[in-house]
Amino acid sequence: MQKNILVLGAGAWGTALALQLAYRGHNVRINSWKAEHNEQMLEDNNNHKYLPSIEKFPSRLKAIQDWQANIIEFDSILVATPSSGFKNTVLELKECILPQQNIISATKGFCHDSYALLSEIAEDILPTTKFALLTGPSFAKELANQLPTAVVVASKDINYARYVQELFSNENFRCYTTTDIIGAQVGGAVKNVLAITAGIAAGMEFGVNAHAALITRGLAEIKKLGLKLGANSETFIGLSCLGDLLLTCSDNQSRNRRFGLYLGQGMTIQQALKEVNNVVEGYFTAKAVYNLAKKHNVEMPLVFATYRILYEAADPRDIVKELMTRQLKNEN
């Protein structure tokens, strides 16, 4: 099943997925929204800016400048932009996408202005276009280096989910399917906020007891919000939630965890963002999750605490004391 795939978004994650598709035998073209970045990839045949460990792209992967003019060449479009650029990317696609083409999203987060799920944004703009989400515990560098990785493909259309599953899967990359696109998105987005929380705790040297408690209670918070939004309970113990939460909270390859680590060590927000020097999705997602939880009357103490640190200049040590001395309660 050889296909022609367009990848929009040439960060580390978009590039790693483009590499995976090329290794799988597909013809892949990748585009960055920055013209100079495209020129670098075309000239050097690599993406050293985001994946320096990959010396050269395989023969089936090349950069492309004017993707709109060449849209007819592609079977599927993979969107791997930051969440801030997702809506505008889909709006661009609306102007040129063909009826037989479909979309795969590798973006995690919520819409920054409406706090809607990204699938809702895509369905609103392109109501007749098939949509799937690829999510789960996966660092770009490890995938690019063909280390074993397992993820989930979520779509309301199980047949389309299976199509995407076949598109990506090989001996190094295993895709499972689900129709719970809400749960898969909530897990993949909120874990970025909790990774910041975990980083703050690590930066303050709180130890592994606190780390374990944070992941466990954080999972409970994700589940509460997800169920309120219409997700299935089983999704939250799978790869898209628990798996991704464990990965992102526990390893400094995570930009969100590193950002939190710097905050816990005493840096300001701006200093920490500058030190990470890349998009920290959890910083923006914290505001969306906070507002969604308030709207739906969902108690999320860890998320609320992280929001206060990020947006209300709360002192992390005061926040920890408040969390630990809240009214005692039953675990469930």
Swiss-Prot record:
It comes from the Bacteria. GO terms for cellular component: cytosol. The keyword Lipid metabolism applies. Keywords: Cytoplasm, Lipid biosynthesis, Lipid metabolism, NAD, NADP, Nucleotide-binding, Oxidoreductase, Phospholipid biosynthesis, Phospholipid metabolism. Catalyzes the reduction of the glycolytic intermediate dihydroxyacetone phosphate (DHAP) to sn-glycerol 3-phosphate (G3P), the key precursor for phospholipid synthesis. HAMAP family: NAD_Glyc3P_dehydrog (MF_00394). Belongs to the NAD-dependent glycerol-3-phosphate dehydrogenase family. This is Glycerol-3-phosphate dehydrogenase [NAD(P)+].
